[in-house]
Swiss-Prot record:
Transmembrane segments: none annotated. It comes from the Bacteria. Belongs to the UPF0102 family. Gene3D superfamilies: 3.40.1350.10. NCBIfam families: PRK12497.1-3, YraN family protein. This is UPF0102 protein Pmen_0910. One of its GO terms (molecular function) is nucleic acid binding. InterPro entries: Restrct_endonuc-II-like, tRNA_endonuc-like_dom_sf, UPF0102_YraN-like. SUPFAM superfamilies: Restriction endonuclease-like.
C-alpha cells in the first residue's frame, strides 16, 4: 500500500472523528458512483453534509483547500445529486458542502470549512 493511500485513509479517519466530536453523525463513508466519490456524508442536526477531505504533505502545489477547484466542486455536486436520488430518505433535508483540509507539513493542522461552496 502506498503512503499516499495511507495518508488518505488516516486523513478521512481524523476528519470523521473530528466531525463526530463536534456533533455530526455519519451517514455514509467513501460513497462512489460513476460521477465521483463522496468522502463523508454526515448529518448535522437536520442538514445533510457532504464532506470533502483533502490532505497535503507539502504546500508546493497549493494547500489542501486550494485543491478543491471548480472542476472538483462540480464533480462533488453531481455525486451529491446522485446520492440524494438514490437515498430518497435524505432528499428533502437541507444540504451543504464542507471541506476538511489537513496539512501535515510541520505540525499537523486540521481546518474544517463549513459551507465551503454552494451547489
Amino acid at each position: 500500500m502506498s503512503s499516499h493511500n495511507d495518508l488518505g485513509r488516516a486523513s478521512e479517519l481524523a476528519a470523521r472523528q473530528h466531525l463526530e466530536r463536534n456533533g455530526l453523525r455519519l451517514i455514509q463513508q467513501n460513497w462512489s458512483c460513476r460521477r465521483g466519490e463522496l468522502d463523508l456524508v454526515m448529518l448535522d442536526g437536520d442538514t445533510v453534509v457532504f464532506v470533502e477531505v483533502r490532505a497535503r504533505r507539502h504546500s508546493a502545489w497549493g494547500g489542501a483547500l486550494e485543491s478543491v477547484d471548480a472542476r472538483k466542486r462540480g464533480k462533488l455536486v453531481m455525486a451529491a445529486e446522485l446520492f440524494l436520488q438514490q437515498n430518497s430518505r435524505w432528499a428533502r433535508h437541507p444540504c451543504r458542502f464542507d471541506v476538511v483540509a489537513i496539512s501535515t507539513e510541520g505540525a499537523t493542522r486540521l481546518d474544517w470549512i463549513k459551507n465551503a461552496f454552494d451547489a
